[in-house]
């Protein structure tokens, strides 16, 4: 039932992260730690350039690019560890945050169901009034 939108909610659901495709999570992580994707791109670039140098037969350039690839991989791992230390939270805090988000989602769902029930009662009351009005018109 939580898949349906609520009239009082602006559409930002807590469970969107769980239901969103993987690339949204990747984009979110890239925004959190922008040095890691840059390091990955640099590593891939060095690998591609080393393969190209090997194809041409330039051993010196290929060797430099292999060295650059290892250096970029090391910098990427360092950025990953540094970002984890800088942005990292205590696992207990993350668990508590998830629990709060789940409770908020349950509360929103409960409010949404109450709103649907209230609207259903309003519709039923309107139908009763319309039926009573029709019956009065038929009697006249």
From Swiss-Prot:
Major localization listed first in the record, in broad terms: mitochondrion
State any GO CC term: mitochondrial inner membrane
PROSITE patterns the record matches: HIG1
Which InterPro entries does the UniProt entry name for this protein? Answer: Hypoxia_induced_domain (IPR007667), RCF1 (IPR050355)
- Keyword Transmembrane helix in the entry? The reply is yes
Tell where it localizes: Mitochondrion membrane
Boundaries of every HIG1 domain copy:
7-98
Which Gene3D superfamilies does the record cross-reference, listed alphabetically? 6.10.140.1320
Task: Work out whether the entry's keyword set contains Transmembrane helix.
Answer: yes
What topology does the record note for this protein and the membrane?
A: Multi-pass membrane protein
Keywords, in A-Z order: Membrane, Mitochondrion, Transmembrane, Transmembrane helix
Its BP terms in the Gene Ontology are: mitochondrial cytochrome c oxidase assembly; mitochondrial respirasome assembly; regulation of proton transport
Membrane-spanning regions, if any? 35-54, 66-88
State its role: Cytochrome c oxidase subunit which plays a role in assembly of respiratory supercomplexes.
Q: How does the annotation summarize its subunit structure? A: Associates with the respiratory chain complex III/complex IV supercomplex.
Q: What does the similarity note say?
A: Belongs to the RCF1 family.
Its protein name is Respiratory supercomplex factor 1, mitochondrial
């Amino acid at each position: 039932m939580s898949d349906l939108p609520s009239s009082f909610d602006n559409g930002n659901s807590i469970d969107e992260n769980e239901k969103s495709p993987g690339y949204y999570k990747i984009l979110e992580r890239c925004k959190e730690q922008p040095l890691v994707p840059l390091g990955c791109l640099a590593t891939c670039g060095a690998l591609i350039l080393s393969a190209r140098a090997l194809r041409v037969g330039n051993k010196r350039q290929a060797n430099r690019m292999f060295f650059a690839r290892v250096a970029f991989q090391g910098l990427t791992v360092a950025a990953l560890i540094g970002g984890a230390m800088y942005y990292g939270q205590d696992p207990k805090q993350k668990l508590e945050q998830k629990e709060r988000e789940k409770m908020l989602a349950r509360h929103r769902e409960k409010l949404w169901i109450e709103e649907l029930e209230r609207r259903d009662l309003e519709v039923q009351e309107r139908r009763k009034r319309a039926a009573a009005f029709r019956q009065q018109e038929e009697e006249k």
